[in-house]
From Swiss-Prot:
UniProt-listed SUPFAM superfamilies: S-adenosyl-L-methionine-dependent methyltransferases
Entry's localization field: Cytoplasm
Location (main, coarse): cytoplasm
Protein name stated in the entry: Cyclopropane mycolic acid synthase 1
GO cellular component: cytoplasm
Single GO BP term: methylation
Gene: cmaA1
Similarity section: Belongs to the CFA/CMAS family.
Subunit organization: Homodimer.
Amino acid sequence: MPDELKPHFANVQAHYDLSDDFFRLFLDPTQTYSCAYFERDDMTLQEAQIAKIDLALGKLGLQPGMTLLDVGCGWGATMMRAVEKYDVNVVGLTLSKNQANHVQQLVANSENLRSKRVLLAGWEQFDEPVDRIVSIGAFEHFGHERYDAFFSLAHRLLPADGVMLLHTITGLHPKEIHERGLPMSFTFARFLKFIVTEIFPGGRLPSIPMVQECASANGFTVTRVQSLQPHYAKTLDLWSAALQANKGQDIALQSEEVYERYMKYLTGCAEMFRIGYIDVNQFTCQK
């Protein structure tokens, strides 16, 4: 495999393999680490995370017996929901050892007879035909230079009627920031640098046109783009409140420095979503 297409194991593990117990202190019981969908204002975080998963899966046209590939499967909530609700076979890919081990336990404890696999591997290493693809909160880690390769692979793996649901945070081009009258400050620039160096090493956000153009260039039609921007601000508010409420345990598990870093990250990102510097979108890509 060429060096440029080796999965970014080190970058992903630097964040996601910090400690499962630490993440449990602020995530909901499904351990879903992406934007929730508050379909109703009175939803709990767990209900809203399941609603987000259902929103994504509902766009795929899943039928019993199909095989769903989950690229960046996290701690397995989307995979297991797909098996439970749609009676499909699932394959999950993750670069995180902790996540892979957790999903293996979920699979071992499941009584459902459908095939359920999790691979400690990147999409760059996967080459099996599947019926549908879902990817929630992983695209941000790929790097702009790999978008074409990812869409090309997805197109090749899917059947003629294949669909991929891509859920990713998106950023604005500086020109768009100016056109929308948003302030370009050193504070904003410093925060972005903090995120890509101390929280998500190697992370880069796509713009909406970038996703649409790469999808189209590789044979997909983007049939729908749905923004969940206000939902991510609320999700982050709930995460930071939970982290703060468990401060003593956070510090005991990690350190005060890690606690402060995560509070800065969660509260700062919530503000970025509220102001409009960043967005989160679900792209429905039809082959």
